Amino acid sequence: MASDTMTVAALSRPFTLGMFYNAVKDELIPGLTLWDAKTLKDNTGENSQHSSDFQISTSDTTQSKSSLLNIEASLKASFLAGLVEVEGSAKYLNDQKRFKNQSRVTFQYHATTNFKQLNMADLGTLDKEQQSIIKRSSATHVVTGILYGANAFFVFDSEKVEADSVQEMEGSMRALIKKIPAFDVEGKVDLKLTDEEKALTQKFSCKFYGDFILESNPSTFEEAVNAYVGLPKLLGEEGENSVPLKVWLVPLKYLDPEVPELINEISIGLVIEIEDVLDDLRRMEARCNDSLVEGVVGDFPCLQEVLTRFQKLCSYYRADLQKTMVKILPSIREGKEDESSLRRIIEEREKSPFSHEKLSKWLDCKEREVNVVWACVEIIPDIKFVANQTELEREVLAPLAVFSFCFIFTSLETADPCLDNMRNYLDGEKSGSSEPTYISDDVLNQMTDKAYTFKKVENDLKGPKVKFFVAAILNKKFPGASVYEYIGGNLHYGMAGCCGCHAGSASLQFGINPQQCHQQSAITPPPPCFKVGIMHVETIRSPLLRRTKTQRVVPKISNFDSSDQSTNFH
């Protein structure tokens, strides 16, 4: 019998001695028991097992979290599939980093108090009524032993930081959080921090998951220290407030041979594969959050919409995987299916639009696009954003807007076949092969060139009757970015061939005299034939990465050629 005894993590579930358990679905069966309360009490032994310790983790994987809670592979598979609903400290399993570029340090307090076990040998054989109770249930095991205690997790998360600062921030946080036990002096808080440590605590927050009832959950480092120091008292002098931590289960087949038994368990290797897939999908969602909180994304609803859509599709796919696992796992344990049916689902992912390679490539392209948009906006700061074509028209038709120039991102609203394939796959439709839509290196470099030129034009022509805007409006004819020039509310197509873009140069030619520009009537637009000069902007291109420095050369104004009457944005 000892060799068939199972041990499972309680995960803050309300286990009691003599309770039924269905190991096929990893679920408790409350309300049914083979013995009355007096019989259970008379046949229960108890031993004191007082202990406490703490651990620190900087990992956010399911593997590291389940290790802190001593969860074995089979129960982990049930949790990953959604068969097990966790409570108390085990809710920590569901807590994920919001951002990829975020430092996280977790402090765990673990305590044990006592162990209770049921003496099965003294309970005798079952009568017909007890056998009938077993047959009416779906139980496979009975609870015969429980280790009591409590867990508490203090999860410290930094604010979003730059990618190259994550490790440094994590190291600083870990060094400080490791000192928490030292702040407990005979049950009282002695919190002495340096100015540097005090400044550090302002850069991260705290979340609490525990088997303790606190007056209020801590949200700061100081509150976390105060809560930690008071935890031992909350267990009670005799551990009366402790909860089940670990449970021992004996198969019911030893009491009734007709009880269905657990035939197979999920292999550790397969559980790790499932874990990796689900963690990978969550990391993709976290990468999306990194981009979504960028200020420039909030300025462009089209960027926000496509990132949110990608994030939701990944979430739907993850839920779909879990739904399938809920059906397959019990069948494998009952011997009705083998592991190949579950492994096949994992393998199919790599052929689907949700493969790691395809999702990562899509995000790479989108993050690069966000970086370039950010770079352009940084070059032309303080320019008014207009949400769409309608708002742009309203601005350029305003009475005071004699001249209007709008820097247009022309490719942000392009349809995305990758997202369409993801949606079709979830709907059960066959997906065609597709590559992420991305803007070429040449176009990306031209976008920043045009932004520098636009900035030079703003500096030279700004005045009460000259307006400048930024917008995202689809225009497939000019990929990347373009400049729209309006005079008296009219878009001048002759000026740079509809919206002013010719690839390969950063020079700008305008048929507008700055002095005359500011003297013009707000009602009568000027003739578009004035020509005062050709302004050139030279740039030294550097890799288009977030927060990298862009080298710039001071713009030069070339000599004016009066014979050239064209107006072009090359």
Predicted features and spans:
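Membrane-permeabilization and membrane-interfacing ectodomains
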Residues: M1-R333, N424, E429-I439, V443-Q446, ...
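Intrinsic low-complexity, polar/charged intrinsically disordered segments
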Residues: S340-K476, G480, G494
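Intrinsically disordered, low-complexity basic segments at termini and long loops, enriched
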Residues: Q515-F569
